[in-house]
């Protein structure tokens, strides 16, 4: 199979998927295409029902959820200073993103929803749609504090059980809040306030002016 033939097949399959999504969701469809990939945006109140349709509709058949993650858009589009906001406006601070695969139709889809409350981000659990997201949702809860309503065992999975805060949030201090060490007097591991002084790190590129130019 030539590269041209393969590219044509991929484009045809992408158009078929777009048409099938339009037929399934109608006026509720919010679809974007970039770099040969489709992203479907779903309102939080339709998160579970939309994902169920994506899995069960014979024309879509996304049997497998290969990834689920949280995203914190707090500083999205910002420079090093708060007033330097140049990026696009988002629908909220926290989003949940899933990447789906249809083995039957051999196509993929990214689906995103926004938590409606920035102070207490919560969306429905997708455990009944794809049981494999169990630990993915626990990870997003642990690192971002996103609550998945209906999850039967929403506990931390990566950090300590007594950990305070959610380390992947953009406002979580880079140095953390506590550090641990072994105390020889108490003969056990103890926690104490972190002793690292936080500082702003501004990335910059240092290179010769003639870098990359012909010599």
From Swiss-Prot:
Reactions the enzyme catalyzes: a quinone + NADH + 5 H(+)(in) = a quinol + NAD(+) + 4 H(+)(out)
Record-linked InterPro entries: NADH_DH_suC (IPR010218), NADH_quin_OxRdtase_su_C/D-like (IPR037232), NADH_UbQ_OxRdtase_30kDa_su (IPR001268), NADH_UbQ_OxRdtase_CS (IPR020396)
GO MF annotations in UniProt: NADH dehydrogenase (ubiquinone) activity; NADH:ubiquinone reductase (non-electrogenic) activity; quinone binding
EC supergroup of this enzyme: translocase
Transmembrane segments: none
Domain of life: Bacteria
Subcellular location, record wording: Cell inner membrane
Matches recorded under Pfam families: Complex1_30kDa (PF00329)
Subunit record text: NDH-1 is composed of 14 different subunits. Subunits NuoB, C, D, E, F, and G constitute the peripheral sector of the complex.
Family: Belongs to the complex I 30 kDa subunit family.
UniProt protein name: NADH-quinone oxidoreductase subunit C
